[in-house]
Amino acid sequence: MSKITLGNESIVGSLTPSNKKSYKVTNRIQEGKKPLYAVVFNFLDARFFDVFVTAGGNRITLYNCLGDGAISALQSYADEDKEESFYTVSWACGVNGNPYVAAGGVKGIIRVIDVNSETIHKSLVGHGDSVNEIRTQPLKPQLVITASKDESVRLWNVETGICILIFAGAGGHRYEVLSVDFHPSDIYRFASCGMDTTIKIWSMKEFWTYVEKSFTWTDDPSKFPTKFVQFPVFTASIHTNYVDCNRWFGDFILSKSVDNEILLWEPQLKENSPGEGASDVLLRYPVPMCDIWFIKFSCDLHLSSVAIGNQEGKVYVWDLKSCPPVLITKLSHNQSKSVIRQTAMSVDGSTILACCEDGTIWRWDVITK
């Protein structure tokens, strides 16, 4: 377990907007009556940078962000199980470049949808409870990791439908896993966090032969020699409550709990003592009225800024390149009153989407001077 080092005071950002950038509401869509839990732009394929996907109820919907604030629906998938409630969705990719969408939720089954053929490519079965988050390996987008209520994280090959590795056990999470994220440049490493208040860093390096084997496996996926990984390389207790979102920022980590703020901190791993090390909280990004769980933030592709919604339907956009932290702007509209469950920033941050508890999607676009 890492220790939080004292003596280094973290720097808190000011809630006075700098208005470095200004945004205006350009669209609002009422998708349905059910809560929308996820909205994600495609960062994997430059052909589809303007395409985003939403998840809510038993439905997954793809949209295109057009110029002048317009949004067009491209396709919609309704799960055969009407009791399904999707909590998370991620873009992935077939080995031939086909765009896939992977979605999971209360039923614990991950549906991998082939966008080109509009069919289910694979259904990934293995989790014993609901799936709270899916993230794709950007360097190898056939690989996804899933965080589950069953206290495990699983690594899958969406092309072959194989569960490669299961991260759980003696050193694993002790309650629901709420968020996962692959390291942006170290292909072997990812972070997970959850209701047990911890953030864990895991390494797949010594199990990479299993990953390679998953691409050439021709037998039944259920016969694949799935490996259990019981111990992370690092565990941190940065927060004192549920940790529901974590994202890598280079070798640093952005994470949030239910304490009205996002933290930027540095995990300092001890190479000779796996699981141990220290943690320095460097910067704090305040987010008022954000003390309930399952509110997730997002960044643009180049990690220049972060956008997060709150319980009142407002979005706070922080500059990640400034120290002390600078609030770029606060986005609000008199009709946006519902909890914002997730935001999505476009590749360059010029468009910000928010999906809400009341089934609405809001679009803000930067005002060009």
UniProtKB/Swiss-Prot annotation:
<dbReference type="InterPro" id="IPR051243">
    <property type="entry name" value="PcG_WD-repeat"/>
</dbReference>
<protein>
    <recommendedName>
        <fullName>Polycomb group protein FERTILIZATION-INDEPENDENT ENDOSPERM</fullName>
    </recommendedName>
</protein>
<dbReference type="InterPro" id="IPR019775">
    <property type="entry name" value="WD40_repeat_CS"/>
</dbReference>
<comment type="similarity">
    <text>Belongs to the WD repeat ESC family.</text>
</comment>
<feature type="repeat" description="WD 3">
    <location>
        <begin position="126"/>
        <end position="166"/>
    </location>
</feature>
<feature type="repeat" description="WD 4">
    <location>
        <begin position="172"/>
        <end position="212"/>
    </location>
</feature>
<dbReference type="GO" id="GO:0003700">
    <property type="term" value="F:DNA-binding transcription factor activity"/>
</dbReference>
<dbReference type="InterPro" id="IPR036322">
    <property type="entry name" value="WD40_repeat_dom_sf"/>
</dbReference>
<dbReference type="GO" id="GO:0009910">
    <property type="term" value="P:negative regulation of flower development"/>
</dbReference>
<dbReference type="GO" id="GO:0006325">
    <property type="term" value="P:chromatin organization"/>
</dbReference>
<dbReference type="InterPro" id="IPR020472">
    <property type="entry name" value="G-protein_beta_WD-40_rep"/>
</dbReference>
<keyword id="KW-0156">Chromatin regulator</keyword>
<dbReference type="GO" id="GO:0010048">
    <property type="term" value="P:vernalization response"/>
</dbReference>
<keyword id="KW-0805">Transcription regulation</keyword>
<dbReference type="Pfam" id="PF00400">
    <property type="entry name" value="WD40"/>
</dbReference>
<comment type="function">
    <text>Polycomb group (PcG) protein. PcG proteins act by forming multiprotein complexes, which are required to maintain the transcriptionally repressive state of homeotic genes throughout development. PcG proteins are not required to initiate repression, but to maintain it during later stages of development. They probably act via the methylation of histones, rendering chromatin heritably changed in its expressibility. Required to prevent the proliferation of the central cell by repressing unknown target genes before fertilization.</text>
</comment>
<feature type="repeat" description="WD 2">
    <location>
        <begin position="81"/>
        <end position="123"/>
    </location>
</feature>
<dbReference type="GO" id="GO:0005677">
    <property type="term" value="C:chromatin silencing complex"/>
</dbReference>
<comment type="subunit">
    <text>Interacts directly with MEA. These two proteins are probably indirectly associated with FIS2. In plants, PcG complexes are probably composed of a member of the EZ family (CLF or MEA), FIE, and a member of the VEFS family (FIS2, VRN2 or EMF2). Component of the plant homeodomain / polycomb repressive complex 2 (PHD-PRC2) large complex during prolonged cold, composed of core PRC2 components (VRN2, EZA1, FIE and MSI1), and three related PHD finger proteins (VIL1, VIL2 and VIN3) that mediates histone H3 trimethylation on 'Lys-27' (H3K27me3). Binds to ALP1.</text>
</comment>
<dbReference type="InterPro" id="IPR001680">
    <property type="entry name" value="WD40_rpt"/>
</dbReference>
<feature type="repeat" description="WD 5">
    <location>
        <begin position="238"/>
        <end position="275"/>
    </location>
</feature>
<dbReference type="InterPro" id="IPR015943">
    <property type="entry name" value="WD40/YVTN_repeat-like_dom_sf"/>
</dbReference>
<keyword id="KW-0217">Developmental protein</keyword>
<dbReference type="GO" id="GO:0043078">
    <property type="term" value="C:polar nucleus"/>
</dbReference>
<keyword id="KW-0804">Transcription</keyword>
<keyword id="KW-0677">Repeat</keyword>
<feature type="repeat" description="WD 7">
    <location>
        <begin position="335"/>
        <end position="368"/>
    </location>
</feature>
<keyword id="KW-0539">Nucleus</keyword>
<feature type="repeat" description="WD 1">
    <location>
        <begin position="31"/>
        <end position="73"/>
    </location>
</feature>
<feature type="repeat" description="WD 6">
    <location>
        <begin position="287"/>
        <end position="328"/>
    </location>
</feature>
<keyword id="KW-0853">WD repeat</keyword>
<dbReference type="GO" id="GO:0009409">
    <property type="term" value="P:response to cold"/>
</dbReference>
<keyword id="KW-0678">Repressor</keyword>
<dbReference type="GO" id="GO:2000014">
    <property type="term" value="P:regulation of endosperm development"/>
</dbReference>
